[in-house]
């Protein structure tokens, strides 16, 4: 008797959907049958385009991830497909290894979303799956006859090669005399980062390791984490603090004063350090990046790494040094790039380590804050309102589409006035004074995201706080 009679029906009945990047849902809905259904459908879609006999598999530190991985591995075995399990590693480490081995991969991770949720990310042998692949996975009708959940034996190869990818770029330990704090919490890469930075010459201080899962969101850094960073920087005399989200594909980096950098500013500095010609970024990124001051071409996309990756195809026709990054800090290398006469192969998926290393390399004879202060002054801020369903978020955006004045009044900005809107992803409103407010539904969880941009940080923060406070008050009426 089949455990999964029809993978399409099992997935549909689970209520789990593809979000901004990967399939996301409640842990209780990711049953072994649902994990198996996603796995066999993914394999079927990949077999239409690629020849392979093995799939790579890895997990983050969420308590539910190992059991989900066991179900995925069991489904692969049922289909006669081998599995290499790389244990707990950052998502980009799995992606790099699987691309090097020309095989598909599955990452069990919920990234930064709340504890009670989890997810599955899928990789083709040539990188992240596309939105077209996602649709194909949801339409496949396949079966799984037997699921035997076995202990998974860990291979260290992905972790070793991920560290080597970056240490091989530098012939000298350029971080000598630098003190780097690693905010470890429950990050999937927490056991890799210390040896990586030590190999580059740094004195490393381990900070904030947690036995419980901590869903760090690099676009909505908590007040507690801001205070921690400032305290650590002072107590340990740090030159920088490095951290990531849960699965290690979004960086969180603080300067010598413990001030966390915005992800898009980090991406800009990394792109400049790499001497990039063309850049693909979501529309939510700081507008100074697309101002024409830094790059030959900037392509604006919807929010989500699949859209950034899709833009690489267009950019590669005219440019040879291509990168992409997001407001969350995740950095995507769209082409091979030579660094210190060493070739760094393209890695078209979000990565947290490359932007950190290039920022530290660029600031090796100065400070991180000095590099940031050289940029034009334009500030962004973002936060989220949790527990807001996608339907409710979309109804807010529809309100703005039908009558912008009504939306501005609803979010407490009725006296601001708007001069333009952009509907590329959600609703991005340019106000009369040139400030920007951007609302969109999260693709990963029932959350409403709010982004703001202004010439003063306090102004950007006030716009986000006012907007979300008014929405929260009205939604709870």
UniProtKB/Swiss-Prot annotation:
Top-level division of the source organism's lineage: Bacteria
Keyword Metal-binding: yes
GO cellular component: cytosol; plasma membrane
UniProt keywords, alphabetically: Cell membrane, Isomerase, Lipopolysaccharide biosynthesis, Magnesium, Membrane, Metal-binding, Phosphoprotein, Transmembrane, Transmembrane helix
One Pfam family linked to the record: PGM_PMM_I
Top EC class of this enzyme: isomerase
Biological process (GO), any one: UDP-N-acetylglucosamine biosynthetic process
Positions with a binding annotation for Mg(2+): 111, 245, 247, 249
Membrane-spanning ranges: 30-46, 265-284
InterPro entries: A-D-PHexomutase_a/b/a-I (IPR005844), A-D-PHexomutase_a/b/a-I/II/III (IPR016055), A-D-PHexomutase_a/b/a-II (IPR005845), A-D-PHexomutase_C_sf (IPR036900), A-D-PHexomutase_CS (IPR016066), Phosphoglucosamine_mutase (IPR050060)
Annotated EC: 5.4.2.8
Cofactor: Mg(2+)
Entry's Gene Ontology molecular function annotations: magnesium ion binding; phosphoglucosamine mutase activity; phosphomannomutase activity
Free-text comment on the cofactor: Binds 1 Mg(2+) ion per subunit.
Active site (catalytic residues): 111
UniProt keyword Cell membrane present: yes
Cell compartment(s), UniProt: Cell membrane
Topology with respect to the bilayer: Multi-pass membrane protein
Predominant localisation class: membrane
PANTHER family: PHOSPHOGLUCOMUTASE (ALPHA-D-GLUCOSE-1,6-BISPHOSPHATE-DEPENDENT) (PTHR42946:SF1), PHOSPHOHEXOSE MUTASE (PTHR42946)
Family: Belongs to the phosphohexose mutase family.
Function description: Involved in GDP-mannose biosynthesis which serves as the activated sugar nucleotide precursor for mannose residues in cell surface polysaccharides. This enzyme participates in synthesis of the LPS group B O antigen.
Protein name, UniProt field: Phosphomannomutase
Organism: Salmonella typhimurium (strain LT2 / SGSC1412 / ATCC 700720)
Lineage, broadest ranks: Bacteria, Pseudomonadati, Pseudomonadota, Gammaproteobacteria, Enterobacterales
Gene, per the UniProt record: rfbK
